[in-house]
From Swiss-Prot:
Note: Secretion of subtilisin is associated with onset of sporulation, and many mutations which block sporulation at early stages affect expression levels of subtilisin. However, subtilisin is not necessary for normal sporulation.
One Pfam family this sequence matches: Peptidase_S8
Needed co-factor(s): Ca(2+)
Recorded name of the encoding gene: aprJ
Note describing how the cofactor binds: Binds 2 calcium ions per subunit.
Organism ancestry: Bacteria, Bacillati, Bacillota, Bacilli, Bacillales
Name this protein carries in UniProt: Subtilisin J
Length: 381
């Protein structure tokens, strides 16, 4: 009898242990968060006076992790799981929760464009971009290149903190088209005396979070840049990105952005972001015969065209190479803006844009060509 009682007690104890173990596993499973993703959390304008600490608390209380709070955009970059996203969308202080999308460089493969946009006519008059600051918001610039004069910069890529290293080559190529030096070697840029600033927002694979791009644009605003070149883009819109682009333009900066390399798709626009925003100058690509490049994105948002096929420019390591893309067309426009500002330093960014667009050479249907090919000689009159 005693043996039977002992066996029953042992069985009960084992049952209790297994029950507690499985109960604990269930609690752990239930408490495990879903896959976290990167988001941008925007706060309502009525909450603009809310302290940074309070904004951080709003996100943290929902289980989110704040990565960065912006200076000119009433928003923060954060890592959130699905539950936190749902709860933040219900919070009365939150205006929006949007995915922190990834933008990619617009370059396809592996120049003449300087003459095609008539930049030498201004060079011969002594206007070469002096005293104009151009922010190249891209993958960094190889500052050791003998054909480039990089005056400063910053990196917003967490894993690649040196803005003067360019693992993708993209930013260095873009920089050369804007301002390769007039020094008898290599190539000549549109605006060879302009001051280049390397604002790194794309990593060595040519990709970058929208939040990195926002940080880069904020840096350009804070450091009083005159021109911003963005040879990058993504397919998704962003309230935060639009806000900071608009802020840059309202601060007096000329903003040129690549339209994209998505070609045309019937009557649908294929222009990417941020070029799609009205405040930017959206740039498409043509070849040396002024024919639209087959890869050049089309849409009603397209503003102007510039050379973007077989563009020879600087590459890391003191070398040179030819690339194709609206990424290569855009720096022709940024360089042209710098040339105009060197001749007319009191002109506003709106005046520069208007002159570039109103004097462009008509090439065809605006859906595919915008206002046409820029003519910086005419624009600077």
């Amino acid at each position: 009898m005693r043996s039977k009682k002992l066996w029953i007690s042992l069985l009960f104890a084992l049952t209790l242990i297994f029950t507690m173990a499985f109960s604990n596993m269930s609690v752990q499973a239930a408490g495990k968060s879903s896959t976290e993703k990167k988001y941008i959390v925007g706060f309502k304008q009525t909450m603009s006076a809310m302290s940074s600490a309070k904004k951080k608390d709003v996100i943290s209380e929902k289980g989110g992790k704040v990565q960065k709070q912006f200076k000119y955009v009433n928003a923060a970059a954060a890592t959130l799981d699905e539950k936190a996203v749902k709860e933040l969308k219900k919070d009365p202080s939150v205006a929006y929760v949007e995915e922190d999308h990834i933008a990619h460089e617009y370059a396809q493969s592996v120049p003449y464009g300087i003459s095609q946009i008539k930049a030498p006519a201004l060079h011969s008059q002594g206007y070469t971009g002096s005293n104009v600051k151009v922010a190249v918001i891209d993958s960094g610039i190889d500052s050791s290149h003998p054909d480039l004069n990089v005056r400063g910069g910053a990196s917003f890529v967490p894993s690649e903190t040196n803005p003067y290293q360019d693992g993708s080559s993209h930013g260095t190529h873009v920089a050369g088209t804007i301002a390769a030096l007039n020094n008898s070697i290599g190539v000549l840029g549109v605006s060879p005396s302009a001051s280049l600033y390397a604002v790194k927002v794309l990593d060595s694979t040519g990709s970058g979070q929208y939040s990195w791009i926002i940080n880069g644009i904020e840096w350009a605003i804070s450091n009083n840049m005159d021109v911003i070149n963005m040879s990058l883009g993504g397919p998704s819109g962003s309230t935060a990105l639009k806000t900071v682009v608009d802020k840059a333009v309202s601060s007096g900066i000329v903003v040129a952005a690549a339209a994209g390399n998505e070609g045309s798709s019937g009557s649908s626009s294929t222009v990417g972001y941020p070029a799609k925003y009205p405040s930017t100058i959206a740039v498409g690509a043509v070849n040396s015969s002024n024919q639209r490049a087959s890869f050049s994105s089309a849409g009603s948002e397209l503003d102007v065209m510039a050379p973007g096929v077989s563009i020879q420019s600087t590459l890391p390591g003191g070398t040179y190479g030819a690339y194709n893309g609206t990424s290569m067309a855009t720096p022709h426009v940024a360089g042209a803006a710098a040339l105009i500002l060197s001749k007319h330093p009191t002109w506003t960014n709106a005046q520069v844009r208007d002159r570039l667009e109103s004097t462009a050479t008509y090439l065809g249907n605006s859906f595919y060509y915008g206002k046409g090919l820029i003519n910086v000689q005419a624009a600077a009159q």
